[in-house]
C-alpha cells in the first residue's frame, strides 16, 4: 500500500531544508466564490504591444490613467527574484514596505504577496479610493479569474471583499515595467533591496517545494555517476549542502 504523498516525500522535504509543518495544507476555501467581490481590474495599457510601443507612449497613457483617477491614492507594488532570493515591496508616496520571502518562493508568489502588502496600506489609510499599479499580469489574471487554488489569491479576495464593504474602493491597474514610470521604478528598487533582508517566516505551498526536490533528484543522479571518485566515497549523497548552510525559515 502506497503511503500518502506527504509521508512519501517527507524525507525529500527534510533534504531540501523543509519540514512538513513548513508546507501549507490544502483546504477548501471558507468563503464561497459567489460571496466574494470581483476586483476592478484595468488592463488599458496591456492593449499595446510592449515590444513595438515606445516607452514615452506608455508613460503618456499612464499619466492619462492617473488623470482619470485623479482623486485616487496611488500605490505601486513589485516583486523581485535574484538567484534563490525572493522579495516583495509596496511603495506609496514616501512610504515603503518590503518583505523577503523564503528562498523557495516563486516570483509569482512574490508579486501576489506584494499585492497583499498593498491591502495593509488600504486598510490603515484614511483614504477611501485607491489605484494600485503592478507590472505582474499573471497576478492580475489569477485574481480576476478567481484562482482559488492559490492561498494568496484566496486571502487577497477575502481582504478585498471586506475592505470594499467598509467603503474602500480599489482599482488594480497593470503597467509595463522598465518604461520609466517612477512609481514602478521605486517599487522595483525597493523589492531588489529587500533581497538582502532577513527571511520572513511563512509557510509555502507544496508547489514551491517541488522544484527543489526535482533539483535534488537530478543532482543525486549526476553525483551517482561519479561513483569512482574519492569524494563520492566520503559523501555518497548530495543532499542540499548549500541549503543546509543557509538560515531556512521555520513555519510558526
Q: Where are the regions that the model predicts?
A:
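Short, charged alpha-helical motifs in flexible N/C-terminal segments and linkers
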Residues: 1-8
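Low-complexity, small/polar and acidic-rich linker and loop segments
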Residues: 10-18, 22-26, 30-35
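Charged, flexible boundary elements
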Residues: 34-67
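RNase H-like nuclease fold core
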Residues: 54-58, 62-128
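Helix/loop segments that flank and initiate small ligand/metal-binding modules
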Residues: 55, 63-80, 84, 203-252
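RNase H catalytic domain
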Residues: 84, 115-185, 189, 199-211
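Acidic, His- and aromatic-enriched active-site or binding-groove loops in soluble protein domains
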Residues: 195-197
Amino acid at each position: 500500500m502506497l503511503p500518502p504523498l506527504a509521508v512519501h516525500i517527507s524525507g525529500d522535504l527534510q533534504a531540501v531544508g523543509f519540514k512538513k509543518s513548513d508546507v501549507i495544507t490544502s483546504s477548501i476555501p471558507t468563503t464561497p466564490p459567489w460571496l466574494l467581490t470581483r476586483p476592478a481590474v484595468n488592463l488599458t495599457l496591456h492593449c499595446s504591444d510592449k515590444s513595438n510601443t515606445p516607452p514615452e507612449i506608455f508613460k503618456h497613457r499612464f499619466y492619462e490613467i492617473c488623470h482619470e483617477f485623479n482623486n485616487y491614492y496611488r500605490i505601486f507594488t513589485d516583486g523581485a527574484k535574484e538567484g534563490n532570493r525572493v522579495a516583495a515591496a509596496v511603495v506609496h508616496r514616501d512610504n515603503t514596505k518590503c518583505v523577503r520571502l523564503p528562498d523557495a518562493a516563486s516570483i509569482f508568489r512574490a508579486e501576489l504577496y506584494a499585492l497583499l502588502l498593498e491591502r495593509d496600506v488600504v486598510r490603515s489609510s484614511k483614504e477611501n479610493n485607491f489605484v494600485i499599479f503592478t507590472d505582474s499580469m499573471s497576478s492580475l489574471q489569477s485574481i480576476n479569474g478567481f484562482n482559488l487554488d492559490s492561498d494568496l489569491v484566496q486571502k487577497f479576495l477575502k481582504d478585498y471583499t471586506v475592505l470594499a464593504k467598509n467603503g474602500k474602493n480599489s482599482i488594480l491597474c497593470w503597467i509595463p515595467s522598465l518604461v520609466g514610470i517612477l512609481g514602478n521604478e521605486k517599487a522595483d528598487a525597493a523589492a531588489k533591496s529587500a533581497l538582502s533582508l532577513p527571511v520572513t517566516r511563512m509557510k509555502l505551498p507544496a508547489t514551491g517545494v517541488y522544484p527543489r526536490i526535482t533539483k535534488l533528484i537530478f543532482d543525486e543522479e549526476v553525483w551517482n555517476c561519479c561513483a569512482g571518485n574519492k569524494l563520492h566515497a566520503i559523501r555518497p549523497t548530495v543532499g542540499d549542502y548549500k541549503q543546509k548552510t543557509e538560515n531556512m525559515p521555520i513555519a510558526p
